């Protein structure tokens, strides 16, 4: 069979397995030639390891200098009668293959990271086959739902404002059109539920569970990822349900840092730049900002994707020559620093007001935006024969 891209709105309904393989290899090739991670961790757990920042973290730490053994947890779907499976499924497989070829452990756990059963499986594996202790825990779970650990009822996140409704343009990748979308005002319950799903509660619970099991090494670090952005995005992000959840995440880092300091450990949130990820394309009215930002940063030669961001985080912030991790006044690591430089934001603001539904494909970097989205799912990568006939049976034999 020949696998074609299928996009519905901003959701990819298909993935190209060997395009995903190429994307993983491209990221590995980048970190192998970048400034290396020195004095880095050797045993790493990545929660949410199959795409975006989680996958990039795993690649950076394994191949970007530290030569870390990694465990990745993700909720992905393999090939079945419903289709070829998700991009993350293949990212996991091909990462593991590359890691093992390099003499590293790249263990994948496929399932629900929120369940006690998954935690126990991971802890058992750490104790019996992974050397017993972790040097770093990366928390990069991006999901819209989380079960209440006591009742099993689902909390569902909402991307809404906490003030007046906001109307703004958003992009439909399926139709290559820009459409107006209104973001409504969240109810108190929606605000609370979003905090439960996207805040720091589950991160803290994981760290507590791992600590109680005795699998955190002395000096272990943990990091989660966040976004703050410029004032131009505040109404939809910073001052909305997402911003409230991220504030909870930031506060959680401080609480975890206090706990982990007793064993020489540290906990941080790294604030990253705006990027095209499976999660970010869902944020209404956010895409015009990304179109303008990408164009300006590429023109200036300072654009970064997930892998560049993570390599810079681990080589220049969390590890390396810094004996003290550089943070801002709120104890946040800032790798959004280039995005927020004054001259870049000035140019982005000037460009945003010029972007319209008629000209967005040329005025902003829509080609780059769409290419990033397609590449998340294994399409549009050089070196891949997209006309090749792929045997479905072969895909079912690939082992995660």
UniProtKB/Swiss-Prot annotation:
Gene3D superfamilies from the entry? NAD(P)-binding Rossmann-like Domain
Tell me the GO BP annotations in alphabetical order.
Answer: fatty acid biosynthetic process
The annotated site for Plays an important role in discriminating NADH against NADPH falls at 76
Q: What is the official name of this protein in its record?
A: Enoyl-[acyl-carrier-protein] reductase [NADH] 2
Specify the signal sequence span: none
Under the subunit heading, UniProt states: Monomer.
Record-annotated active site:
237 (proton donor)
Q: Which source organism does the UniProt entry give?
A: Photobacterium profundum (strain SS9)
């Amino acid at each position: 069979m020949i696998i074609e891209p299928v996009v519905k709105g901003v959701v990819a309904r298909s993935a190209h397995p060997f395009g995903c393989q190429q994307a993983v290899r491209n990221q590995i090739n980048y970190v192998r030639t970048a400034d290396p991670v020195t004095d880095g961790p050797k045993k790493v757990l990545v929660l949410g390891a199959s795409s975006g920042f989680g996958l990039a973290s795993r690649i950076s730490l394994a191949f970007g200098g530290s030569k870390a053994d990694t465990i990745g947890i993700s909720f992905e779907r393999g090939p079945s009668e419903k289709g070829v499976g998700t991009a993350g499924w293949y990212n996991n497989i091909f990462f593991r293959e590359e890691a093992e070829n390099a003499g590293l452990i790249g263990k994948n756990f496929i399932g629900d990271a929120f369940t006690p059963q998954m935690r126990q499986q991971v802890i058992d594996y750490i104790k019996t086959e992974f050397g017993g202790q972790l040097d770093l825990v990366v928390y990069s779970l991006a999901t819209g739902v989380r079960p209440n650990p006591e009742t099993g009822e689902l909390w569902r996140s909402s991307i809404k404002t906490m003030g007046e409704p906001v109307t703004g343009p958003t992009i439909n990748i399926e139709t290559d059109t820009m459409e107006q979308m209104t973001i409504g005002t969240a109810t108190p319950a929606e605000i609370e539920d979003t905090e439960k799903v996207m805040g720091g509660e589950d991160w803290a619970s994981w760290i507590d569970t791992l600590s109680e099991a005795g699998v955190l090494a002395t000096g272990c670090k943990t990091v989660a990822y966040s976004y703050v952005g410029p004032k131009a995005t505040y109404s939809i992000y910073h001052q909305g349900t997402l911003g409230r959840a991220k504030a909870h995440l930031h506060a959680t880092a401080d609480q975890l840092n206090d706990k982990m300091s007793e064993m020489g450990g540290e906990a941080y949130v790294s604030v990253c730049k705006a990027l095209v990820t499976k999660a970010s394309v869902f944020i209404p009215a956010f895409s015009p900002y990304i179109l303008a930002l990408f164009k300006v940063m590429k023109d200036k030669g300072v654009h970064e994707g997930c892998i560049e961001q993570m390599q810079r985080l681990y080589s220049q912030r969390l590890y390396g020559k810094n004996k003290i991790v550089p943070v801002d006044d709120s104890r946040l690591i800032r790798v959004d620093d280039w995005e927020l430089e004054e001259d870049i934001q000035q140019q982005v603001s000037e460009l945003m007001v010029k972007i319209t539904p008629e000209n967005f494909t040329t005025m902003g970097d829509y080609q780059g935006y769409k290419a990033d989205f397609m590449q998340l799912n294994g399409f549009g990568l050089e070196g891949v024969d997209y006309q090749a006939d792929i045997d479905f049976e072969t895909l079912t034999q690939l082992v995660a």
